[in-house]
Amino acid sequence: MSSNSHYFDLKDYSFKETPKGVRVFWTAMKYVVLVIACVLVIIPLITVLIGSFKTKTELMNTSAFILPKSMAWVNYARAFTNGRVLEGLGNTIFIVVVSCAGSIITGTMTAFVLQRFNMLFTRLIKAVFLATSLLPTITMQISVYQIVVKLGLVNTYGAPLLLYIGTDIIAVTIFIQFLDNISVSLDESAILDGCSYPRVYWSIILPMLRPAIATVLVMRFVAIYNDFYTPYLYMPNHRVVSTALRDLTTGSNVSWNVVFAGVIICIIPTLIMFLSMQKSIYSNLVSGSVKE
């Protein structure tokens, strides 16, 4: 940067040139924020885990952080039987697996068409996708519910499956952004070698979208697994995880130790999903593409 210049040029400045004391301070602040965030997340989980092993009397008369005198495993058995948690887990896993698979297939296909084919209304369709994602979901529920009723899908698995697969606008947006970084020359080379567009999609595009698929998979899994409104409204006679936990809290004499046990049971699949997918998300987030 010129000595005669009165303006600050970011190109001539780097974090390494800051005083050592300032670097140490900001590094320490980052770790302090991370520790505080971890504590805020972990403390509620610890209290729920401890409470799930207490008796009802012990839970009401002791501190949330005091360990139980004996492990009340019966709370977990009661959560499975009284709250129909096992039924809810089975229904939820079925809905999640089918919905995630459908979202990935329809999302990648839609993104492939919108990003690769310069049709007349491509930009308009993208704008409509973005605009609809900004609308509050609750504002469309009356018309959506009427459509579901006319299709005869109330109290069936078809209603949540149709809604989860057909309204995944965020997944389409993520796939389009990843496709922007994949060279079109790969498609052209494959077509010159005799590949059809479905073969290009299946053999080239889909494998290169693995980082985006992993990200969407985790997002959709958590969103669908935790959703209460859709299954409660469209399939009230079938239990999922969220509605099964609600059943444990109904009535005048709620056993919160059993509720805590149900919460821990329902957390386990989400935890397993994240731990199994985090390596793929973090290590492959910016890989797998050729830029022009």
Task: Give the predicted meaning of each segment.
Residues N4-K11, P19-V22, W26-E292:
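A structural signal for multi-pass alpha-helical bundles of membrane permease subunits
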